[in-house]
Each structure stands twice: as structure tokens, then as C-alpha cells.
């Protein structure tokens, strides 16, 4: 499946521009994995601006109330996008990291399970929320984040990420569950 092409008068193919700057680290964190490292996108100010502008232009008229970001790289992207859209930011954290009353959601990993949490007062009924992470692999983390927000009465308008790894099935899972999904680029393989 080809990437959707995002065009810019200054840069041309923005999708390609950003995709070329994502570093691939073979065999990390384990043999056979091709890790897609987004940190080069964050290190260069021009590239970071281009990345954030992609999300800001997509969501500037979406009538959102909040942006929620998933621990940890979703915090980086989500907080900047929230700031640029003049919205509040909600962190969805790994279990045991939030100091106030929380709501938790367990989800399955390839080997075992994990839990994410959100403050019980993080959003209110009717809030329209953009849910952000850096990458979609199996979709489990984003699905858990969506469930947390919906349990608090919010509507997740869309899930958004920089990278989709479609072979791992996450984007298919999320689409199948009725969650609209936007990603900047796709990479085949793990």
C-alpha cells in the first residue's frame, strides 16, 4: 500500500521528505526487528516544524477539545500539536506513573500484557479528542488509549501517528474497530 502523498509548495512531497529522515535500526531491540527511529525528525528544527505542521493543518478545523498522547513518544508529538492548536494535552501513561486517581486499561502484547492509565478527571463527557502516538504496530496501545478516553465519556475523533507498520496489523485492527486513523508514512516489515 502506497503512502498518501502530502504536498507542500516549498518541499514538494512532504511524506517522502519525512520518511527519508526516519532512521531504520536493524535488529533492535531484538534480532529480526527493523526499528523505525523518529528521533532524527525531532533533532532538526526544520524537519520538526514540517512534521508538526502536517498534523496542525490536518486538525486545525476539526473542532477538537483535547489532544491525548501515549507514553512516551506520543507525549512529544501530542504536546506540541496541542500547543499549536491551542488545546489541552492529556498524557496516557504506563501503569503506576500518574499521581492522582486513575482509570486503567490492560492490553495484550506479543508476549504478555501491559497496562496504561489516565487520570480520572483527564477529560469530560462530550470532549472531542485526538489520540496521538509515534507509531502504529499491533494497535494495542492506541486501542487501550481509546478505551480509556471513551470510558471517561470522550469521543476519539481520530488516531494519529507518524509511522504505520501495516504488516503488524495495527492499522487494520484500529480501522476494524471503527477508529479513523491518520499516519504520515508507512514502512513494510517489522
UniProtKB/Swiss-Prot annotation:
Q: Which GO terms describe its biological process?
A: adenine salvage; AMP salvage; purine ribonucleoside salvage
Molecular functions per Gene Ontology: adenine phosphoribosyltransferase activity
EC no.? 2.4.2.7
User: Annotated pathway, please?
Assistant: Purine metabolism; AMP biosynthesis via salvage pathway; AMP from adenine: step 1/1
Q: Which GO terms describe its cellular component?
A: cytoplasm
Compartments annotated for it: namely:
Cytoplasm
Gene3D superfamilies recorded: 3.40.50.2020
Please give the PROSITE patterns that the UniProt record associates with this protein.
PUR_PYR_PR_TRANSFER
Q: Which reaction does it catalyse?
A: AMP + diphosphate = 5-phospho-alpha-D-ribose 1-diphosphate + adenine
**Which domain of life does the protein's organism represent?**
Bacteria
Keywords attached to this Swiss-Prot or TrEMBL record, sorted alphabetically, are: Cytoplasm, Glycosyltransferase, Purine salvage, Transferase
User: By its UniProt entry, which PANTHER family does this protein fall under?
Assistant: ADENINE PHOSPHORIBOSYLTRANSFERASE, PHOSPHORIBOSYLTRANSFERASE DOMAIN-CONTAINING PROTEIN
Subunit details: Homodimer.
Q: What does this protein do?
A: Catalyzes a salvage reaction resulting in the formation of AMP, that is energically less costly than de novo synthesis.
Q: Which family does it belong to?
A: Belongs to the purine/pyrimidine phosphoribosyltransferase family.
- Name of the featured protein: Adenine phosphoribosyltransferase
Organism equals Cupriavidus taiwanensis (strain DSM 17343 / BCRC 17206 / CCUG 44338 / CIP 107171 / LMG 19424 / R1)
In the record, what lineage is assigned to the organism producing the protein?
Answer: Bacteria, Pseudomonadati, Pseudomonadota, Betaproteobacteria, Burkholderiales
What is the name of the gene encoding this protein?
A: apt
